[in-house]
UniProtKB/Swiss-Prot annotation:
This is Large ribosomal subunit protein bL27. The keyword Nucleotide-binding does not apply. InterPro entries: Ribosomal_bL27, Ribosomal_bL27_CS. GO terms for molecular function: structural constituent of ribosome. The gene is rpmA. Residues 1-20 are annotated as: Disordered. Belongs to the bacterial ribosomal protein bL27 family. It comes from Treponema pallidum (strain Nichols). The keyword Ribosomal protein applies.
Amino acid sequence: MARKRGGSGSKNGRDSNPKYLGVKLFGGQHARAGSILVRQRGTRIHPGENVGRGKDDTLFALAPGVVTYLQRKGRRLVSVCVENRPS
C-alpha cells in the first residue's frame, strides 16, 4: 500500500463562468422590440404588457416603448408602455 496519496493535493481551484444576470433596462428607459429587459433564474420578475418570456426566464420587449416596473398582487411585473406617435 502506498504511504502517500498520489498527485493532486488540492481539491479547490475551480470556478464557474459568470452568467451576467440582472436588470438590463430600468424604469423610464426606452426599449426596442426584442431588447432584453431582465436576465434571471426563475421568475423573480414576471412579464407584464408587451413583455415576453424566454425559455431561460429572460424577459424581453415585444413592442417598442418605455419600460415600467410595478408590483401587483405581491408580484413584481415589468411592462413596456407603447408610445402612440402621430404619423
